[in-house]
Amino acid sequence: MSGILHLFFIFAQNFKYMIRKLYVLILSLLVATSLYALESDEIRAVWLTTNYRLDWPSVAGTTPRVIERQKQDLIRILDQLAEVGINTVFFQSRIRGEVFYDSSIEQQSQFLTGSNGVKSDFDPLAFAVEECHRRKMTCHAWMVCMPLGGKKYIARHALDKTLARNREFVTLHDGEYFLEPSDPRTADYLADIAGEIVSNYKVDGVHLDYIRYPEKAASYPDQQRYARSGKKKPLAQWRRDNITHIVYTIYNKVKSVNPDVQLSSAPLGVYNGRFGKHYYGWNAFEAGYQEVERWLQEDKHDFIAPMMYYKGAMFYPFVIDWCKRSYGKPVVPGLGIYRLNEPGSNWDLNEIEKQIWWSRHLGASGYALFRAGNLLNDFPALLWRIRYLNE
């Protein structure tokens, strides 16, 4: 009997060992699968800002010497981004009524040319697309949609003609001019710009920014327009429908030109202010009138990059919330690495590293860093960590 018990004990020990080995094998396969998905599918993006020449170009002008400097600076930036594993660039192609490409609709930015009303022989968007593709990176044309600027900005950038040409669908609010969301001509105007880009450039996507109502929307002067609409729905839903109409018009235009070009946007970082026991006033649905969940559900977006420039309890629960609302579309949390520079912000490099790690494990499809200059110029230690996380 003792011999039988001894054999049973050996079998039991070996069985437990085999189960442990099987568990380790399965876990290893899952990890390997996860790593493969990370390498092949994850969106690792950066916003490359041209407004005020924050990231690029470092110099403005149209002489051959300046143009060559602009090209070399952009090559250097893209080389550095590719080296640390960034695979997606949101290249700011339209700012406030000005563009960084050869357009028949809007003028080239003085941040590129150095002067108003001047056209450069250099086409930055074409160059950015070519150089991104050379590095196996995707390039998305980043469009700032609604704001045109204040009176001083309009004068300084000689946008008075643009303003006058579109005056019937422009609204002055809190000292700033905005394309009017409720006027159908706004949707057509922005769709024409997106269509022009997709028709003339081999971009991988069009990325919409500021596709919302402005701050202090409670005092936004659209009451007469709302009254003329017949007030058939609440003001808030009427506004959301206005933004949705713009998004859908742009989407339809982009896909009609090239179905393979993606449409994405950067909504506000919190979707709905009523979250658990708390209320967050600055949110996409109620403050910006962005009905993002509807856009995703009705297949009018390919992915989103919400601007989640917060940390801790203001970050992680909302990653989960966005993923739950995404209807299977990729969610790419926008990380505010510029916060590391803010006095008294109490941010450190570990925070960004944790946000990337947790985003990957909470169901997100990558991350987007705001912005390129902060990553490449301000935080060399973060640059090293990003490279490590992307390997």
Model-flagged regions — what are they?
Residues 86-87, 126, 135, 158-160, ...:
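Polysaccharide-binding and catalytic clefts of secreted carbohydrate-active enzymes
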Residues 41-43, 49-71, 141, 146-196, ...:
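Active-site-adjacent "subsite" loops/lids of carbohydrate-active enzymes
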Residues 66-81, 186-196, 282-298, 318, ...:
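Short, acidic/polar
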Residues 95-143, 230-257:
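Aromatic-lined substrate-binding rim segments of carbohydrate-active enzymes
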Residues 54-68, 107-121, 174-188, 232-243, ...:
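The substrate-binding groove and active-site-proximal loops of carbohydrate-active enzymes
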Residues 72-98:
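Catalytic domains of carbohydrate-active enzymes, especially glycoside hydrolases
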Residues 292-293, 297-315, 332-391:
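Substrate-binding cleft of secreted/luminal carbohydrate-active enzymes
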Residues 50, 262-280, 322-352:
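Active-site clefts of carbohydrate-active enzymes
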